[in-house]
Amino acid sequence: MKVELKILNKELIKELPGYATEGSAAIDLRACISESIYLKSGECKLVATGIAINIANPNYAAMILPRSGLGHKKGLVLGNGTGLIDSDYQGELMVSCFNRSQETIEIEPLMRFAQLVIVPVVQANFEIVEDFSQQSVRATGGFGHTGV
């Protein structure tokens, strides 16, 4: 599938985004910043990526996810859990970074700090009803209803 990628900051030409291996599901996003950003414990900041994408197909979206190693080893996760990029958004990709560790985290210029994956989506046709046409076995069982 073709997704247009626009380089907004020429510094990124040194480190173009791409898949690390043939089996990679996501591309790494780099911090497109001129100097290091320091995140104190519990702090959240937006970090620029220097790129924009044009998915242009409403059957797909992009998701920004944390990099596993940084989240597990350093405590660098996303401030909003997951970043959802709609197919018609064409602005710069920004990443909300949150430090869940007790130590200050440094995000260095051009550091790989998040990842982007393209996923299929379905736009549902919602029908307003008084009652559901069928009741599931679970019905209204909510949080913890199947055990902890």
From Swiss-Prot:
Cross-referenced InterPro entries: dUTPase, dUTPase-like, dUTPase-like_sf, dUTPase_trimeric
Single GO biological process annotation from the record: dUMP biosynthetic process
Family listed: Belongs to the dUTPase family.
Cofactor(s) annotated in UniProt: Mg(2+)
Keywords: Hydrolase, Magnesium, Metal-binding, Nucleotide metabolism
SUPFAM superfamilies assigned to the protein according to its UniProt record, in alphabetical order: dUTPase-like
Pathway: Pyrimidine metabolism; dUMP biosynthesis; dUMP from dCTP (dUTP route): step 2/2
Listed EC numbers: 3.6.1.23
Reactions listed under catalytic activity: dUTP + H2O = dUMP + diphosphate + H(+)
Superkingdom in the source lineage: Bacteria
Gene Ontology molecular function terms on file: dUTP diphosphatase activity; magnesium ion binding
Cited Pfam families: dUTPase
CDD domains xrefs: trimeric_dUTPase (cd07557)
Protein name per Swiss-Prot or TrEMBL: Deoxyuridine 5'-triphosphate nucleotidohydrolase
Function field: This enzyme is involved in nucleotide metabolism: it produces dUMP, the immediate precursor of thymidine nucleotides and it decreases the intracellular concentration of dUTP so that uracil cannot be incorporated into DNA.
UniProt: substrate binding residues: R67, S68, G69, N80, L84, I85, D86, M94
Native organism: Francisella tularensis subsp. tularensis (strain SCHU S4 / Schu 4)
